[in-house]
Amino acid sequence: MRVVILGSGVVGVTSAWYLAKEGHDVTVIDRQDGPAQETSAGNAGQISPGYAAPWAAPGVPLKAIKWMFQRHAPLAIRLDGSSLQLRWMWQMLRNCDTSHYMVNKSRMVRLAEYSRDCLKDLRAATGIQYEGRQGGTLQLFRTEQQFDNAAKDIAVLDDAGVPYSLLTAEQLATVEPALAKVAHKLTGGLRLPNDETGDCKLFTERLAKMAEQAGVKFIFNRSVDKLLVEGDQIAGVLCGDDIIKADAYVVAFGAYSTALLAGLVSIPVYPLKGYSLTIPITDPASAPFSTVLDETYKIAITRFDDRIRVGGMAEIVGFNTQLAPARRETLEMVVRDLYPHGGDISQAVFWSGLRPMTPDGTPIVGRTPLKNLYLNTGHGTLGWTMACGSGQLLADIIQGRRPAIVADDLSVARYRTGFQPLNIAPLHDIHPIR
């Protein structure tokens, strides 16, 4: 079968890889000059199924108001009056109750755990190298309330079968030695030993080369103007003066998927702007061993081979990708506070990207009402975490094979009035880990 994939970020390239392994004739189209040039280029580097959770959570609306007056707030909103932004924010607000949160988190953890397993299998089969580490993740708490809330909320990890350990401030240095010097600033941490890290851009570039060797064709520097429809299916992709035809089409366009699908399939995917710094390491012993997540500022600090990646924050500002100096100050403040001697911040590379976020936090993977059109988008801040599982899942669906995990509630059909998912045991009715 001929399959066209629109988008060459980590989600598009993993989709191409798994479809090619099934024997399909795959073509990937992207406006950039190579893979992983946008959202996949500078993310925080975490592969963290245990922390997979929607931003739409109980308490977030009130926190958002409080954050408006904080210099280093993890979330910022700039209203532009567009119907897309207002509608998406309203949909997100409707998901900020406990019942919605638990359903959404259950979906996300299910896919994220599966995706990590798929990544392990891919790594074993190909030997792909991407500065990956399997050293777990560590969520850091600065207040007693954060620590106490985590102690109450770990039942969500028990339900998902995720191993964890709750550490006191004195125990943090056993997994992150450099934190010994700043333990007095912290109250403890939650460690997830099965989580991983790695350079998403490097992984995507190298997997794209492997996919090309497996027969995948990549068309770069080509804008995608329109999906052409005939009857109940896609007839081709209009790229300038050319029409590219296939038997099946996959939209993996990230935050730009919504506009491309306008008038064909309605999806609530909106850009959530994030930032990162990439810092050269000057003292390996003073740098992170794996990765930490500062719970107060929602910022991750991740170790690559000879670099530190500091990433996080969220801005609801439309498609604005301008670099905000105030956001750089926040990233620098956090890394200086926790790892003051790890790297040369004066040599840091500052980056911003647009994560494709759904209001319920769960990506959209699977079929659409158009019989040969498939979606793999809306992964938000977890594209790297969920990419391999989403790619394998999509390949199974296109292949007509039953997926290894329940997937009906991951498709766009879940937004349809009256949608009833398969019977899945919910997570405990508890407060979210935030």
Swiss-Prot record:
The UniProt entry, under InterPro entries, shows: DadA, FAD-dep_OxRdtase, FAD/NAD-bd_sf
What are its GO biological-process terms? D-alanine catabolic process
Q: Does the keyword Oxidoreductase apply?
A: yes
**Gene3D superfamilies on file:** D-Amino Acid Oxidase, subunit A, domain 2, FAD/NAD(P)-binding domain
Keywords (alphabetical) are: FAD, Flavoprotein, Oxidoreductase
* Entry keyword DNA repair: no
> Which co-factors does it depend on?
FAD
**Its annotated pathway?**
Amino-acid degradation; D-alanine degradation; NH(3) and pyruvate from D-alanine: step 1/1
The catalytic activity of this protein is classed by the Enzyme Commission as 1.4.99.-
Please report a single Pfam family linked to this protein: DAO
Spell out the GO cellular component terms annotated for this protein, sorted alphabetically and separated by semicolons: cytoplasm; plasma membrane
Q: Which NCBIfam families match?
A: PRK00711.1
Q: Which HAMAP family match?
A: DadA (MF_01202)
User: What biological function has been recorded for the protein in this entry?
Assistant: Oxidative deamination of D-amino acids.
Name of the protein in its database record: D-amino acid dehydrogenase
> What species is given as this protein's source?
Yersinia pseudotuberculosis serotype O:3 (strain YPIII)
Kindly list the organism's lineage. Bacteria, Pseudomonadati, Pseudomonadota, Gammaproteobacteria, Enterobacterales
Record gene name: dadA
